[in-house]
């Protein structure tokens, strides 16, 4: 009798802080099994202060890689498989806009920290640091998040993230 092939089912932890959170516009991506596996694990907070801002004409929440600035950011941890991570890397334009890095997240008083993947904006115009910092993201009518399929191809989000000095 042959052995059944062992499927690698190692799951990673992913911290989400913006439109991917439960009840937010892009959470359906995590909920779709066509993108891979994702399961809510717990609520969490960053272990260091980071600036969370809403920017671009599409009101995208960005977590800037600028430790010590901003607030401790509240979000959610999901257990995800490699297929989901690849789907999210494509969604988040990994390498073009975001980078995915491993950071420790607080999971509660007395509970400690857990290492999680998180999407951070590495390169950004300095004017993003002058925007209002948030400790938690919620889609709103004052800054309505524009889903990717509703954005115009003439103006990709990265066009709003110019790195040159503005006159």
UniProtKB/Swiss-Prot annotation:
Class in the EC hierarchy, top level? transferase
Question: According to the UniProt entry, what is the EC number of this protein?
Answer: 2.3.2.-
| Assigned keywords, A-Z | Acyltransferase, Transferase
Sorted alphabetically, which Pfam families does this protein's record hold?
Answer: GGACT (PF06094)
Q: Which InterPro entries match?
A: AIG2-like_dom, GGACT, GGCT-like, GGCT-like_sf
- The entry's active site is 92 (proton acceptor)
Q: Please provide, alphabetically and separated by semicolons, the GO molecular function terms listed in this UniProt record.
A: acyltransferase activity; gamma-glutamylaminecyclotransferase activity
Organism of origin is Drosophila melanogaster (Fruit fly)
Q: In which tissues is it expressed?
A: In embryos, expression is seen in heart cells of the dorsal vessel and hindgut visceral mesoderm.
Task: State what this protein does.
Answer: Putative gamma-glutamylcyclotransferase.
Name the UniProt record assigns to this protein: Troponin C-akin-1 protein
């Amino acid at each position: 009798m042959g052995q059944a092939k062992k499927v690698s089912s190692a799951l990673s932890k992913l911290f989400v802080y913006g439109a991917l959170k439960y009840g937010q516009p892009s959470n359906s991506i995590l909920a779709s099994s066509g993108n891979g596996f994702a399961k809510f694990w717990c609520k969490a907070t960053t272990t260091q202060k980071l600036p969370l801002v809403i920017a671009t004409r599409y009101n995208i929440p960005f977590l800037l890689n600028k430790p010590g600035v901003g607030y401790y950011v509240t979000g959610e941890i999901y257990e995800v498989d490699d297929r989901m991570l690849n789907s999210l890397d494509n969604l988040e334009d990994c390498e073009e806009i975001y980078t995915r890095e491993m950071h420790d997240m607080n999971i509660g008083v007395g509970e400690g920290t857990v290492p999680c993947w998180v999407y951070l904006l590495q390169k950004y115009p300095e004017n993003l640091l002058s925007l209002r910092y948030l400790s938690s993201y919620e889609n709103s009518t004052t800054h309505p998040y524009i889903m990717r399929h509703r954005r115009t191809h003439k103006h990709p989000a990265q066009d709003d993230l110019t790195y040159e000095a503005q006159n």
